[in-house]
Amino acid sequence: STQAKTLFPYTTLFRSDSITVIEKNKDKAIIISCGSAISALHKVGIKPDIHVETERTKIVYDFLVNLNDPEYLRDVLFLSTDVIHPDCASLFNRSALAFKLSEPGAALYHNYFPHLNACAALGGVNPLVGNIGVSAPIHLGFKNLYLFGLDNGYKHKGHHHSKLSSYYNNEESAGALGEMMYGDSLWQREGNFGETIISNAMFDTSRWVIEQVLAANEDVSCFNCSDGVKIERAKAFPSADITLSIPVDKSALLGEIGTFCAPIPLSKKNFEPLLDIEFFNIFIDKMVAEWQQDFTSRNEINQLMLRNFGYLAQISATRQQHIAQVMIGSMNYVFTLLSSILYSFEDEEKTLVLMQPAIGLWLEFLEKAKEMYPQALDSVDMIDNEVMNLFRA
């Protein structure tokens, strides 16, 4: 697998000339579709060899079902991480999951079951599906990647994904989806083939993460055929210049990937006692008690946030580090908002009054977290996201 070429269609500006190149070389490379790119490939009758996803929400499953072609998906290899919506794998005959680095599942497995087979924990798979599209094949040993549609931005606001993808099932929906994704994005970045690309924080972070993955894997040759943002360590490469000549034995190669995989001989019962609900509640109760005070200065609030982060650092050094990983995202998010409010006005006394309802929401969240944590192993998103209606023709 180390010498195989990988054609990697992503979700954004997936042009018709790219489709022609992929069609021409589909027997000479492994095609990996990322997220909504599969809808563009489906529309022109090209089947990827591997499909990757990264989000844990039900809309990922609903999007795949919306292709309305179950047989198309059956013999595609599905690759993702342990946080993916569990229904996704039911659409494919073959699926393989790796742990997502820095998520609780990886910590629990590695801390409590070191006697079992070592399992991969993938980093660099966030924030967007294109990130796992780069990280996963590199981890599997692929050395030559060709990126299509990995734009991480756009030249023209009305054109943000392939015209063949489900984003453009109707014009009104395409506009609404574009507004959701980009809004008032004003970041300007250097383009892969020149010009300027408009990006935003999420897409720019995705670009940066890809650059870090490529920097850590200098033996990988990455060719960026996308008419989007420049990616360091990915050579700008017009798709028309791709000249692959050696056919790939896809069955053998995908079979080889299968040899890297094995079921984990554990069930929910093995993990339930490891959650340590008692310790989680002690941790939450301690923070609740500390936040239920009358603050007299900005500094008191700042110091309390730092102290709470200190608790996470201490927990991270123990076998309960999964608890720190459960809470770190929410604490980062809420404390960022609290810090922003804390310095919104010059008058300290008035600011502290404004902080009270914000702190109240934080306390509400902590109480809700205590309710939710015991059900962590059964918590699966079953919400029908109304955004799905925009993808339907």
Where are the predicted features?
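Long, compositionally biased charged/polar accessory segments in the mid-to-C-terminal portions
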Residues: L214-A393
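Acidic/Gly/His-enriched mid-domain segments of enzyme catalytic cores or analogous surface patches
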Residues: H42-L140, W291, F295-R298, N302-N308, ...
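Glycine-rich phosphate/pyrophosphate-binding loops
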Residues: A37-I38, V44-R56, L140-H161
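Histidine-anchored nucleotide/phosphate-binding helix
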Residues: I22, A29-K43
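Short, polar loop motifs at secondary-structure junctions
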Residues: G35-S39, S80-P86, S226-K230
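Single conserved hydrophobic/aromatic residue that forms the stacking wall/gate
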Residues: T2-T12
